[in-house]
Regions:
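Surface-exposed, interaction-prone regions used to assemble/regulate multi-protein complexes
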Residues: 1-140
Length: 140
C-alpha cells in the first residue's frame, strides 16, 4: 500500500479523481472515507492506457470543524450535516454508486467535492463541503 499525505497548505497538489466511480462513502468519527474501486479499468489516459496504475484508492479526509452535504434535484435540495446526521445521509445514498466529477478548494481552503448519483434516486447529485485538516490517499 502506498500513502500520500496532504496537509491543508498542500491541498491544491492532490489528484482530483475526475470521472471516477466511488463505490463507498462513509464517515467515522471526524473522518470521511471515500473508496474508488477498479481504477485501472475506468479512466483512460491520452496514450490509451489506464490513467491510474493502482486498482483501488481510499481517500481519508480528516475533518477539522464541519462536513455537510447538499443533495440536488431540479428545484429542490436537501441539506445534511454529516457529523450530526450521518444516518440520514446513509439512508439517502443506500445502494448507490457515484461518479466523482469535480473537486474545488474555496478561498478559505475548504474542500468541495461534487458527485453524480448513478442509480435511480430521488436526487441527481450532491456536493460535500468540509473543513479538512489533512487528507490521506491509500493506494492499493
Amino acid at each position: 500500500m502506498n500513502l500520500q499525505i496532504y496537509e491543508k497548505d498542500k491541498f491544491v497538489e492532490m489528484d482530483s479523481m475526475h470521472d471516477s466511480i466511488a463505490t463507498n462513502i462513509s464517515i467515522k468519527d471526524k473522518t470521511l472515507l471515500i473508496t474508488y474501486d477498479n481504477l485501472n479499468e475506468g479512466v483512460i489516459g491520452r496514450d490509451g492506457q489506464p490513467y491510474y496504475k493502482s486498482k483501488k484508492l481510499t481517500i481519508e479526509y480528516v475533518i477539522d470543524s464541519y462536513c455537510d452535504v447538499k443533495f440536488f434535484r431540479r428545484n429542490k435540495y436537501k441539506y445534511v450535516d454529516l457529523l450530526e446526521e450521518n444516518n440520514k445521509f446513509y439512508k439517502l445514498i443506500n445502494g448507490c454508486s457515484f461518479m466523482s466529477y469535480k473537486y474545488a478548494i474555496d478561498s478559505f481552503g475548504e474542500i468541495i467535492l461534487f458527485f453524480n448519483i448513478l442509480e435511480k434516486n430521488k436526487y441527481w447529485c450532491f456536493e460535500i463541503s468540509m473543513d479538512a485538516e489533512k487528507i490521506i490517499y491509500h493506494w492499493e
